[in-house]
């Protein structure tokens, strides 16, 4: 009888501990999925030495691109807000104040 009681207690302890472990693993997995999704939704404007022209602020554009001051950087942001994201580098030529020389200086620094 004593052995039966001990066996029942041990089995109960195993069942309870395994359900706690399963809940903890499920909670950790859900938390990591939420964190990963949140990180994926925010595309960084500057990736190493590249600037995402579609997500960068005027300040980031000014700091990262050669020959772009505050006014041109703001013009890029305003153009993007009015016309949508840039699909290629040549579209920057449509922004007032951005010419071919400025585009060529920065072409390798821009990503979309």
UniProtKB/Swiss-Prot annotation:
Which Gene3D superfamilies does the record associate with it?
A: AF1531-like domain (1.10.150.280)
Secretion signal, residue range per the UniProt entry? 1-21
Gene Ontology annotations of biological process type? protein secretion by the type II secretion system
Keywords, comma-separated and alphabetical: Repeat, Signal
Keyword hit for Nuclease: no
Q: Please give the Pfam families that the UniProt record associates with this protein.
A: HHH_3 (PF12836)
GO CC, one annotated term: type II protein secretion system complex
Q: Which residues form the HhH domain?
A: 49-79, 80-109
Q: Which PANTHER family match?
A: ENDONUCLEASE/EXONUCLEASE/PHOSPHATASE FAMILY DOMAIN-CONTAINING PROTEIN 1, ENDONUCLEASE_EXONUCLEASE_PHOSPHATASE FAMILY DOMAIN-CONTAINING PROTEIN 1
Would you tell me the protein name for this molecule?
Uncharacterized protein HI_1008
Q: What is the lineage of its organism?
A: Bacteria, Pseudomonadati, Pseudomonadota, Gammaproteobacteria, Pasteurellales
């Amino acid at each position: 009888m004593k052995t039966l009681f001990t066996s029942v207690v041990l089995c109960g302890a195993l069942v309870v501990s395994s359900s706690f472990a399963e809940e903890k693993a499920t909670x950790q997995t859900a938390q990591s999925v939420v964190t990963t999704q949140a990180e994926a939704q925010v595309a960084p404007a500057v990736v190493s030495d590249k600037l995402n022209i579609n997500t960068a602020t005027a300040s980031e554009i000014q700091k990262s691109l050669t020959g772009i001051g505050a006014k041109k950087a703001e013009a890029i942001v305003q153009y993007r807000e009015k016309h949508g994201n840039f699909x290629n580098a040549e579209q920057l030529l449509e922004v007032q104040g951005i010419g071919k020389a400025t585009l060529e200086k920065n072409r390798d620094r821009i990503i979309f």
